[in-house]
């Protein structure tokens, strides 16, 4: 005779492994060609200048330069700018147009 009623089995107890998605290189960071900038599901962020997109929507640098995030027409874009372009963009942002 059992001294205790058997407990019911649970339907929980599973967990999927994390996919490590998200931004890997942030605005203003220097990247080398081939560096992954964003891992994503679908096009949450679109590739801009000097940025390629993999079959899994991963965005990566095509050239060495600085990461630049911007919003155009309600869409987010990420570009890789050369040091000269980066200086120009930062000057415009800070109101120091030559």
Swiss-Prot record:
The keyword Transferase does not apply. GO terms for molecular function: ribosome binding; structural constituent of ribosome. Residues 1-11 have a biased composition (Polar residues). The keyword Plastid does not apply. Residues 1-20 are annotated as: Disordered. Belongs to the bacterial ribosomal protein bL27 family. This is Large ribosomal subunit protein bL27. It comes from Aquifex aeolicus (strain VF5).
């Amino acid at each position: 005779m059992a001294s205790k009623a058997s407990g019911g089995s649970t339907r929980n107890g599973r967990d999927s492994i994390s996919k490590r998605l998200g931004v890997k290189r942030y605005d203003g960071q220097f990247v080398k060609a081939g560096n992954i900038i964003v891992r994503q599901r679908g096009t949450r962020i679109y590739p801009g200048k000097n940025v390629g997109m993999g079959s899994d929507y991963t965005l990566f640098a095509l050239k060495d330069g600085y990461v630049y995030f911007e919003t155009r027409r309600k869409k987010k874009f990420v570009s890789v700018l050369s040091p000269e372009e980066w200086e120009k963009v930062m000057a415009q942002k800070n109101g120091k147009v030559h």
